[in-house]
């Protein structure tokens, strides 16, 4: 019998662990199914197709053209006004044309710009990854925290109900006054209001979780206050990592490179272009005189658009200004990166210190509440109903503060990774 009970509890434990959902599993779910992230992945595919379109400019084009017409002359007169003989024809024309651009100073720059565009799309995808994964962490930790606070408030309501019943009994015995019972009733009403508020917050956070991550069974979520990956151990290392990985900086660098290519493309509009074409055509029932004709045409074309009313020079000036703008944005991104990493590091340190303080606060509040409640119930001490209410309130606030501070500490760790540029699927091992 003892072995049977042991086996049952082991099976129950294994089943519980198997069905539990960790933050890693939630992040994988968000990574694979989030709509915003999937939309950004399509943007990468668009950039890849743009490169293929630009690459086609280097290849020859082939065109086949066929036309067929039918003539039906209703009346034909000669110069003297008499009727002339009518000889209608039904011409058929078929041609195939091969054309190759030989010189185009802009297509090389355009091709390089599209290659940069793929790198840019990848960086934007990684940035969107960070945003969605951080939202998922917020949703995951937020749902757990609101569930904890709902449970804390539920237990507080039960405690207030028990206290009110005790005070009513003590009132009948003459141990407390009617005002003490009124205080307990007021305290219960306040506890019920907070409980209702916590229930509403839980529902809101559950909806947010389902929107960002997907469906969830709240009872399967495992709480964690430590990041699932290593975080930098110093501010200096965090800053150095951000210089390599920060996506905003990388995006600004790539957009600057694209602006430089736009200048080259604009200048190429003032340069000559050259193309070569070969066309073979076949005509049947060509005219009343000739029946068939087959000919080949080899054609070389050189074009030099040297004047367009100042439009092309204005385009060059415009792109020069865009380049200056992108340079300024890059400088600003570098400065913001330093500020964000430093702020994230400071927030992590302060949230950890605050968490330790709140833990000590909860422990002290529990000891104080236990002692005050025991004195009050014994009737031997000088503790009043108000003392118990205040003690319960301090403990409640400390417990809720602990739930919030544990979540804030977890978010601070991931926010540091986000500011560095490491809150990605590859670093978190989501693939």
Where are these regions (language model features)?
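Periplasmic alpha-helical coiled-coil/stalk elements that build and connect Gram-negative outer-membrane
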Residues: 2, 25, 131-243, 255, ...
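Bacterial N-terminal signal peptides
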Residues: 7-14
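Gram-negative outer-membrane assembly/targeting C-terminal domains
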Residues: 14, 411-431
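Bacterial Sec-pathway N-terminal export signals of envelope proteins
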Residues: 19-67, 73, 217-257, 305-306, ...
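Small/polar (Gly/Ser/Thr/Ala-rich) solvent-exposed segments
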Residues: 38, 61-84, 88, 100-127, ...
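Amphipathic alpha-helical coiled-coil segments
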Residues: 39-54, 128, 132-152, 162, ...
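Hydrophobic, lipid-facing positions within transmembrane beta-strands of outer-membrane proteins
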Residues: 92-98, 238, 296-302
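Short, charged, amphipathic alpha-helical segments
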Residues: 115, 178-187, 317, 385-393
């Amino acid at each position: 019998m003892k072995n049977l009970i042991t086996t049952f509890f082991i099976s129950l434990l294994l089943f519980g662990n198997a069905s539990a959902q960790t933050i890693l599993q939630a992040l994988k779910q968000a990574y694979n199914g989030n709509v915003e992230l999937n939309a950004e992945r399509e943007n990468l595919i668009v950039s890849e197709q743009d490169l293929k379109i630009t690459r086609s400019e280097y290849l020859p084009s082939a065109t086949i053209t066929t036309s067929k017409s039918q003539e039906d002359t209703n009346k034909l007169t000669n110069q003297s006004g008499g009727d002339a003989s009518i000889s209608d024809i039904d011409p058929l024309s078929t041609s195939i044309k091969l054309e190759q651009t030989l010189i185009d100073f802009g297509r090389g720059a355009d091709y390089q710009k599209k290659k940069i565009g793929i790198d840019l799309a990848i960086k934007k995808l990684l940035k969107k990854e960070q945003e969605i994964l951080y939202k998922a962490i917020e949703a995951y930790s937020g749902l757990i925290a609101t569930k904890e606070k709902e449970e804390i408030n539920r237990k507080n309501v039960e405690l207030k109900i028990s206290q009110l019943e005790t005070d009513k009994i003590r009132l009948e015995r003459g141990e407390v006054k009617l005002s003490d019972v009124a205080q307990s009733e007021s305290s219960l009403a306040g506890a019920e209001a907070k409980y209702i508020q916590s229930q509403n917050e839980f529902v809101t956070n559950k909806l947010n979780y389902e929107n960002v991550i997907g469906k969830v069974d709240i009872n399967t979520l495992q709480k964690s206050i430590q990041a699932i990956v290593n975080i930098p151990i110093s501010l200096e290392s965090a800053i150095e990592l951000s210089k390599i990985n920060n996506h905003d900086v990388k995006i600004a660098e790539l957009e600057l490179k694209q602006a430089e290519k736009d200048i080259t493309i604009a200048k190429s509009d003032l340069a000559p272009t050259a193309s070569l074409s070969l066309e073979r055509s076949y005509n049947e029932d060509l005219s009343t005189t000739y029946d068939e004709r087959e000919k080949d045409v080899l054609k070389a074309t050189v074009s030099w658009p040297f004047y367009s009313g100042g439009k092309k020079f204005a385009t060059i000036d415009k792109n020069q200004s865009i380049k200056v703008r992108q340079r300024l944005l890059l400088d600003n991104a570098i400065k913001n990166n330093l500020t964000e990493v430093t702020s994230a590091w400071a927030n992590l340190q302060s949230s950890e210190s605050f968490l330790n303080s709140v833990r000590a606060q909860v422990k002290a509040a529990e000891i104080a509440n236990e002692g005050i409640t025991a004195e009050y119930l014994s009737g031997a001490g000088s503790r009043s109903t108000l003392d118990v209410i205040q003690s319960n309130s301090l403990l409640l606030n400390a417990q809720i503060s602990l739930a919030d501070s544990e979540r804030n500490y977890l978010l601070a760790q991931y926010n540091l990774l986000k500011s560095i540029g490491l809150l990605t699927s590859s670093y978190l091992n989501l693939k």
